[in-house]
Amino acid sequence: MNKNKNLTINQTFELAVQKHQKNNLQVAESLYDKVLKVDPNHMGALNNLAILFQALGEDQKAKIYYEKAIKLKPNHAIAHNNLGIVFNKLGEDQKSKSCFEKAIKINPNHADAHNNLGNILKQLGEDQKAISCFEKAIKINPSYVNAHYNLANVFNRLGESQKAISCYKKVIEIDPNFTEAYWNLHVATSNIDESLSILKKLYKIDNKNTKAKIMMSVLQGYKGNFNEFNNLLASSDSNHPYTRSIKWVFSLPKLPKIFFNRWDFFDAVIALSENSRPFYEFGVSKGISFQYIINTFKKGFGFDTFTGLPETWDARSKGSFSNFGSVPKIEGGEFIVGKFEDTLPEFFSKERPKASLINFDADLYSSTLCALNYSNKVIDEKTILVFDELIMHKNWEKDEYRALNEFCDNLGFGYEVIVVSFLTWQVAIKLKK
């Protein structure tokens, strides 16, 4: 570094930028530090150090330097946007949202800020506002592939399948190698042959995509050809959670109906249910599924703390799926707030109407078993039980699946699997009491 000893501040900064661009981050950091020792208010060094630390995943340091840069230049839209990204990674959603809003106020044509704000709003359950943000980003930049993709995902989550399909196709038109769009497009379809065709295109682009390979074998199985799946069972993918899940389904006495997304799945279940009865849902979160189901049944009972998971589950941390204590306002919905072990004994101590369907979306073994035990009073031969995460995830045999089988073993019940949606992890059954 001695040869850099007599460089001016500007020369040192320019050298730091060169090292930064060549991904020599350690040297770049040292040079930016030298600039700041001479000039603590050097905007370029502050901003670039923030970018450098952000790239390294050192978000707390990145936050400090972005805040210093913004203090010097409050109208720096890019810095506000980048700080918003950092806050999002740190789990500070409201601060993240505020940063993106500031970036947009400074520069209304900042497409990235509109897209990022849309993602935060989606995380907060404000889907309609998120849609508006993604559409604004696309209006600014019609070829903004991530905005099209994010818009598709919101439509998919809301059950607007045709809009989602149109957006996924637009993503693929812009970027034919966008594999996630192919994957989600095949989920949004409702036809085995069409879904299989999409997966084949995906696999042609990425022949190491294990999930695509497994799902192609499933669809072939549903068409009567189990050769590919049998090959999977003899391969290194035999212990993949998808393979284990499908093996269980294929071992059932009767192959259940298959659907590709939660809304087609729910439509099929609702069509088989007693619509004159109310439904029950254990695990409401933001109420998206509850709202969809109640459009048919008009009356529903929902149980949740509305503060998220009580403990870590799968790859989700404690507090995931939180609605921040806010109870959804849904016409016809009656919500019982609190932990199942606290609220269910009192609720079911009174006579309750038999259930048309019960949606178990509690994820955890203990919570699901608790809900099953207490809701048994409203279950009869006509009730359909839906388990929202029964299969496909890493430890599926230890959670809702375990709770269901333990519940049935304890009471001497059997069950018939009637509908399955592999890609949304959902299974619908009827008990045989």
Where in the sequence are the language-model features?
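Short coil turns that delineate tetratricopeptide repeat
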Residues: 6, 40, 74, 108, ...
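Class I SAM-dependent methyltransferase Rossmann-like catalytic core
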Residues: 221-276
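S-adenosylmethionine/decaboxylated-SAM
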Residues: 274-433
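TPR-repeat structural position
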Residues: 25, 59, 93, 127, ...
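Alpha-helical segment of the N-proximal tetratricopeptide repeat
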Residues: 7-38, 51-55
